[in-house]
Amino acid sequence: AQGGTNVSGGQRQRLCIARMFVADPKVYVFDDSFSALDATTEANLNAAMREIVQDRTVIVVAQKVSSIKHADQILVMEAGRIVARGTHDELLQTSETYREIAASQAEVDA
């Protein structure tokens, strides 16, 4: 990129995420930070994150199930209210809202 001005949205997101890992905070907050990443990059990042942030608190705000399906706890919100809480597998069993979201993104069996 020319002076850093010619980067794509996905490249910009990867740079911001890399800066956060270098800073090594006790709490990581990702607010829809993976939306511009392709599926392969997102999967690689999620795998690396699980190792890097083992002893840290990680909060992920996401619309993509693939971004949060390995989380210890997922909060499902609808109309500004928490309507379900659990792991990916638990929510597939207990939350119609989560099942619908996962099915619409083809994440039911993944």
Annotate each language-model stretch with its function:
Residues L15-C16, V22:
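ABC ATPase nucleotide-binding domain helices that frame the ATP-binding cleft
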Residues I17, V61:
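Hydrophobic anchor residue at the start of the ABC signature
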